[in-house]
């Protein structure tokens, strides 16, 4: 399970964020990006020593200052369910056209077929001689 997929699933859920400097932030996750920057709403910030508290309507936390995240167990279960659901798909389903197997049709965009070299030089190109 990748951390960013876990955070995307945790949107709207409460979570605890501890920073490297010891401060903790409790709030509801609004959004996160690929650098793990986090936007929280209804936040309670606790100081490093735990004796001061601040209530904020929202806050933004830079990803490289985060020490760890605590998300509810229901979010982790939800991510695992989604992973097992996608793992059960038959191979090739929902994966685009792909290369597939040889069906005897045209194969790519090259300079022609092997018959062009064996038979007379018909078609494009100047040829030799």
Curated annotation (Swiss-Prot):
Subcellular location: Cytoplasm; Nucleus
The record's account of how the chain is modified after translation: Methylated by PMRT15/SKB1 in response to salt stress or abscisic acid (ABA) treatment.
Disruption phenotype: Severe developmental retardation leading to plant death.
Skewed-composition ranges (Basic and acidic residues): 79-90
Expression across tissues: Expressed in roots, leaves, stems, flowers and siliques.
InterPro entries found in the cross-reference section: Lsm4, LSm4/Sm_D1/D3, LSM_dom_sf, Sm, Sm_dom_euk/arc
GO cellular component term of the entry, any: plastid
Annotated keywords: Cytoplasm, mRNA processing, mRNA splicing, Nucleus, Ribonucleoprotein, RNA-binding, Spliceosome
Gly residues bias spans: 111-129
Top-level taxon in the UniProt lineage: Eukaryota
Stored Pfam families: LSM (PF01423)
SMART domains registered for this protein in UniProt: Sm
Domain Sm as annotated: residue spans: 2-75
The keyword Transmembrane appears for this protein: no
GO BP terms: deadenylation-dependent decapping of nuclear-transcribed mRNA; mRNA splicing, via spliceosome
General function of this protein: Component of LSM protein complexes, which are involved in RNA processing. Component of the cytoplasmic LSM1-LSM7 complex which is involved in mRNA degradation by promoting decapping and leading to accurate 5'-3' mRNA decay. The cytoplasmic LSM1-LSM7 complex regulates developmental gene expression by the decapping of specific development-related transcripts. Component of the nuclear LSM2-LSM8 complex which is involved splicing nuclear mRNAs.
Family: Belongs to the snRNP Sm proteins family.
Name of protein: Sm-like protein LSM4
Organism annotation: Arabidopsis thaliana
């Amino acid at each position: 399970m990748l951390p960013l997929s876990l955070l995307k699933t945790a949107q709207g859920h409460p979570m605890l964020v501890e920073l490297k400097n010891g401060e903790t932030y409790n709030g509801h996750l609004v959004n996160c990006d690929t650098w793990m920057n986090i936007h929280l709403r209804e936040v309670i910030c606790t100081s490093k020593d735990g004796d001061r508290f601040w209530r904020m309507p929202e806050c933004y936390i830079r990803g490289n200052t985060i020490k760890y995240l605590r998300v509810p167990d229901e979010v982790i279960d939800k991510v695992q369910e989604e992973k097992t659901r996608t793992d059960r798909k038959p191979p090739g389903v929902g994966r685009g056209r792909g290369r597939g197997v040889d069906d005897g049709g045209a194969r790519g965009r090259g300079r022609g077929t092997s018959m062009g070299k064996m038979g007379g030089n018909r078609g494009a190109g100047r040829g030799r001689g």
